Swiss-Prot record:
Organism this protein belongs to: Methanosarcina acetivorans (strain ATCC 35395 / DSM 2834 / JCM 12185 / C2A)
Gene Ontology terms for molecular function: DNA binding; DNA-directed RNA polymerase activity; protein dimerization activity
Assembly with partners or alone: Part of the RNA polymerase complex.
This protein's GO CC annotations: cytoplasm; DNA-directed RNA polymerase complex
Protein name: DNA-directed RNA polymerase subunit Rpo11
């Protein structure tokens, strides 16, 4: 994955995520819009095989980079929990 910040203000962020697909972007968007500090979160991908997705975040004034980092940490925690639960189930 290669990440390129296209635009950043105090409450908005536009990030290109090269090589990523709907899988990661949908997960990020879904978690971002559940955050009370986020006023808008969506992504645009013109065509999955010829363009890279661009993620847009608008916050209530909270640093959007901080919000995105915290969202990534939530995803990591959820994956860790899944590994734990799956390992226990697989060994039962």
């Amino acid at each position: 994955m290669e990440l390129n910040i296209l635009n950043k203000t105090n409450n908005e962020l536009e990030v290109e995520l090269r090589g990523e697909t709907h899988t990661l972007l949908n997960l990020l968007k879904d978690l971002l819009i559940k955050d009370e500090r986020v006023e808008a979160a969506f992504y645009d991908m013109k065509h999955v095989s010829i363009s890279d997705p661009i993620l847009y975040i608008k916050t209530d004034g909270t640093d959007p980079i901080l919000v995105l980092k915290e969202t990534a940490a939530i995803i990591i925690a959820q994956c860790d929990e899944f590994i734990d639960v799956f390992s226990k189930a697989a060994n039962a």
